[in-house]
UniProtKB/Swiss-Prot annotation:
The gene is argS. This is Arginine--tRNA ligase. The keyword Acetylation does not apply. GO terms for molecular function: arginine-tRNA ligase activity; ATP binding. Monomer.
Length: 566
């Protein structure tokens, strides 16, 4: 086990009473540069307990701590304890662990097989899959991979928006201006054009809105014509969506859209009634949340039709009963914060103790060059266009720089789509993103292609070496600052995965694999690898193999391929 941070916490635990091992572990920091040690422990939080100045506490601990052979020294500076590892021992332990664990390096059984439901993507049927949907899809997909890697049993759910008043609008538009042959030829774009036309015409003729509501009511009452059109629109849209999911290498365990819960809503209404949680307000049924500083949660309209909140409550109850989840995560943008807070509170008021286990994983919105993406106005950037454009762009670069690369169509696909996904996941999820073609296709700096190219570079070195890589190395060759920086970033990787899971933040992994790539490229530039000295060569090749392995795992956890050649 190469977890030197754990070893530091164990040394501290022998001298510090009243603080648990886990808390000590979380207090340990990695200094910004190696002159300040490899691990640092701030004594400021101990000042109140020990009734001494942090500097004094640090001095006393330095005098008491008995170092093992894993460490060269410990000193104190300004209230910090600074631990310096034995570089030889450290390098060998890290490299051995990575090479022995292979593609399972960083994997842990934290979840012990417990079920985690992750609700992500969830586009609307009969509307296009635009770049605004990308964030939920790729964040959810990455969280699925991270939780799975840490021993949870993940259930990926696509809660399709396949029910609602928009279908009434599309039916009205189709009956007034639609062409069946056009829809069969190009379903998504034709349905979008009809949806946009409906809103344009409704501004001039508001009666169309009433007509649309009427068609949706027919759907809810089981009208044969309305349901037949709805099923047709839905099946055509889902076929197109699955093509895009295949491009993104995203999968779901369940496609259960809003319509799946049509027969489960009355039970929710009845239960709310029995618990005296429902109040009538202007003919509609609400749950009053004024006591919790929230507007009322509307669960049933005046005409008896249900709303998103009702369906979400029904879905959550169904998921708990079906999957008995440890957690249920909902990956949607922050504009829905209030909606989730409201119905989460309703679940709690209904007496379900698992209300604490459902969580909204919110993220910032995507705008297109400063404007919000809205399908009703037609101002959308279709995701399929972006992905295909990225693949074409990479194909051009390959033809220019390396036209003889094997499987160049597949490489172009892996790198082009990887660039788009990486661009999204390199940002903290809560940040708004302004989508622009130039940014999405930029391959300079901290980008997906940069990390993928680093993986391909490491793969190339290993192919040229034509030797079996082993962890039986002389680690004395790996103790210089540049090489140690590579090894440190590798050693931190397992904790980075855990941090990403705890915070539900894939960008933590994305940023770290950029750090690994940068550290490796400095190592590659400064240190010839295929040298005459066999012992030195094998030690450096072991570092190359470890980097390749960790980059491959890291890219996989964010849903990106790791090409062997580029």
């Amino acid at each position: 086990m190469s977890d030197f941070k754990q070893k530091v916490s164990e040394l501290l635990g022998t001298q510090i009473e009243g603080i648990g091992q886990r808390e000590l572990l979380e207090m340990i920091e990695v200094p910004p540069n190696s002159e300040m040690g490899d691990f640092a422990f701030p004594c400021f939080r101990l000042a109140k307990t020990f009734r001494k100045a942090p500097q004094v506490i640090a001095e006393e601990l330095v005098a008491k701590i008995q170092l093992t052979d894993d460490f060269e020294k410990v000193d104190n500076t300004g209230g910090y304890l600074n631990f310096f590892v034995n570089r030889n021992t450290y390098a060998k332990a890290v490299i051995q662990e990575v090479l022995s664990k292979g593609d399972q390096y960083g994997s842990r059984n934290l979840g012990e097989g417990k079920n985690i439901c992750i609700d992500y993507s969830a586009p609307n049927v009969a509307k296009p899959f635009h770049v605004g949907h990308l964030r939920s899809t790729v964040i959810g997909n990455s969280l699925y991979r991270i939780y799975d890697f840490l021993g949870y049993n993940c259930i990926g759910i696509n809660h399709l928006g396949d029910w609602g008043t928009q279908f009434g609008k599309v039916i009205v538009a189709y009956k007034n201006w639609g062409d069946k042959a056009e829809i069969e030829k190009e379903p998504i774009n034709t349905l979008l054009a009809l949806y946009v036309k409906f809103h344009d015409e409704a501004e001039k003729n508001p009666d169309l809105e009433d007509e649309a509501r009427g068609w949706f009511t027919k759907m809810e009452k089981g009208d044969e014509e309305a349901l037949s059109l709805w099923k047709w629109f839905s099946s055509e849209t889902i076929k197109e969506l699955k093509k895009i999911y295949a491009l993104l290498d995203v999968h779901f365990d369940h496609y259960s859209g809003e319509s799946f819960y049509n027969d489960k809503m009355d039970v929710v209404i009845d239960e709310l009634n029995k618990q005296n949680l429902l109040k009538e307000s202007q003919g509609a049924n609400i749950v009053d949340l004024e006591e919790y500083n929230m507007p009322p949660c509307l669960v049933q309209k005046k005409d008896g039709s249900t709303l998103y909140a009702t369906r979400d409550i029904a879905a959550a109850i169904y998921r708990k009963n079906t999957f008995n989840f440890e957690k249920c995560l909902y990956v949607t943008d922050y504009s829905q914060n209030l909606h989730f807070a409201q119905w989460f509170k309703v679940i709690e008021l209904m007496g379900y103790d698992w209300a604490k286990d459902i969580e909204h994983i919110s993220f910032g919105r995507v705008t297109h060059e400063g404007r919000r993406i809205q399908s009703r106005k037609g101002s959308v950037v279709l995701l399929e266009e972006v992905l295909n454009g990225a693949v074409e762009r990479i194909s051009e670069i390959i033809e220019e720089k390396n036209p003889n690369v094997e499987n160049k169509e597949q490489v172009a696909k892996d790198v082009g789509i990887g660039a788009i996904v990486f661009n999204d996941l390199s940002n903290n999820r809560i940040k708004d993103i302004s989508f622009s073609w130039d940014t999405a296709f930029s391959f300079e700096g901290e980008t997906g292609p940069y990390v993928q190219y680093t993986h391909a570079r490491a793969s190339s070195v290993l192919r040229k070496a034509e030797v079996a890589i082993t962890d039986h190395i002389n680690a004395a060759h790996l103790t210089d600052d540049v090489t140690m920086n590579v090894i440190k970033t590798i050693e931190q990787f397992p904790q980075v995965i855990v941090d990403a899971q705890r915070k539900n933040e894939p960008s933590i992994i994305t940023r770290h694999i950029v750090n690994i790539a940068q550290a490796f490229n400095r190592f590659y530039h400064d240190h010839p690898i295929l040298v005459e000295d066999e012992e030195l060569k094998m030690a450096r090749l072991a570092v190359v193999q470890a980097v390749k392995q960790v980059l491959s795992v890291g890219l996989s956890l964010i849903g990106i391929k790791a090409p062997e050649k580029m």
